[in-house]
Amino acid sequence: MSSLADTVEGSEAKRGRFSNNALTSDTGILQKNSTLRNWFLKPTADLKNSCEDRVEDDVNDVYLNDKNSQKSVEERKLGRKVRSFFKQTNSNKDESVLEDEDDALVWKKTSNKCAKKENSHDIQKGSFTKKIRNSIFKSANDVKEFRNENNLLLPVELSSDDENESHFTDANSHVMQSKSPEKIPSKDQCLTKGAKNKGLKKEYEKSFEEYSDDSDDEFSPATPPENVLEGPYKFVFQTPNTFTSQPNITVENDFHKGGRHVIDYLNKKLATMNIDIDLTSGGKQNVSWEEELDQLSDHVIESITNHISKGRMHAQEKQDELEKLKLENLNLSTLKQENLQHKQEINSLKDNLESISKKNNDLILEMNKLKKKSTNNKTNEYISTDENENEEITKSNMGPGILELNVNETSKKLQQSTFKPSKYLPRETRNNENRLKHLEKRIFGLEKSLEKKKKQVRADSVRLDLNRYTIDQFLTLLKSLSEVLQFHNVYGNDLKENDDNIIKIETCCSALNMKNCFEDSSFRLQENSFKRQLGPLFANINFSLIDQLTMNFRFYERSANFQKETIGGLRMMLQDKDNYIKTLMQHLKKKESTKLIKDSKNGASTLTS
């Protein structure tokens, strides 16, 4: 947002401090100091419907002077314009020559034309202080209707860094409104007059467009407040009844905390988020409200980040716990499924056994019934055959109503019929017998399979887990097992059949003392016998490791035997040497004895001679 006040000193931070009394007194700072007047008055214009004829050229001159950094010339020109305006608004009838006649004439024309079109009750006479007083203490019925709100110029921007004074902002302030837009030259005419400074005009137009876009802020109302001066220029004085809250002036040591609304908003938001932060802690009187806001914002950001990081850590821990619980649940579910499967298998086997036993009982009953029926049928058949064959009945000694049978023949035939083979039996009996045989074979096979399963369960319960043992412990265990095997003479036999021996081996291994070492070479293990006999016991271990261990064991044994053999050879050598020495000594003794004998003989011969 561009304005004349920004070109005087270059920044808003360098503006002077003043109170409300300076605006309502004839001999105040605003009347005496030209720079304050220039800061206070900001006669900018809307290029469409406001005074542009002279003001825009002056603004362009100021922009040029600002680029050339001629601050003294700027202050002089602005001082002339402001003085001419105040002399005209104070209703002085002196029409003496001003310092800049052209500028004064422009302001007079605009003010007179605006005054003609006003109503009688809107015309205000008197000094500048009366206008201010009338604007502040105006009644509610005398509120003026602002028809041309779009013609409002840029707002006056007054700032005060004093802690106990009012703050003037752009949001609730309005400036000069032209009351004679009919005789103001058009935009094209203004642009032709200042053809030299086209670039500056474009920048100036952009600044107004930016302000028009920003004018829809929530703090800038559609209609200006009541405390607005009337005339060619309108001023706004912020009172405690306006938009923003003001500090208590009565308290001397109170200091204004500029971000109080922001702090309240943050307190509410943090309370909804269940975050406890003392935003009022750490406030110092010597620190400005901007620095205090920065400190508070940093404190809030740090606390929020810490809270978020803690929340993330808790969430991660919960996720890890949930994953662990999920894994445990999966393991439990798998175990439950396996248990259910085993139970179902056991129940199915039980059902099969019960059904088979029932079938056996039924078949036994049927067999008994069939046997009874077969005996009855046999007797009936035999009787029928006997009757057919014995048709020749003796009737010689037969009285009335008496039959005589040949008893001898019937008895012989009955004896022959009892020795009939099975092929002469009826089909039903033969089929039932075949069924019984088949069922008996099946029952026999099931009983064998059950016995095998029982043996396997016993063997599995007896097996050892060698993964628990170290290498040294395993070597000692091998030695102890070899001793046990030699003691029980299990070589050449399968350990599956010798359950008692397996149990004894397990007891010996459990009662094994690791300090015992068997150094005898007679307790060697052979690979083939080891694999053949101890395979079912050590089903969970790799035989390559056993081979390596046995090879190492054999190497140590061979080295020990070699040492023993070398020692034995040395002993033999020593013994041979001893024998050789003995033989030499004997030989020497013999030589000495022969010499003595010869000497004695020679001596005797000499004596005789």
From Swiss-Prot:
Keywords: Phosphoprotein. One of its GO terms (biological process) is ascospore-type prospore membrane formation. Residues 1-24, 162-225 are annotated as: Disordered. Residues 169-179 have a biased composition (Polar residues). Residues 210-219 have a biased composition (Acidic residues). The modification Phosphoserine is found at residues 159-160. It comes from the Eukaryota. Residues 200-209 have a biased composition (Basic and acidic residues). GO terms for cellular component: prospore membrane; septin complex. This is Spore-specific protein YSW1. It comes from Saccharomyces cerevisiae (strain ATCC 204508 / S288c) (Baker's yeast).
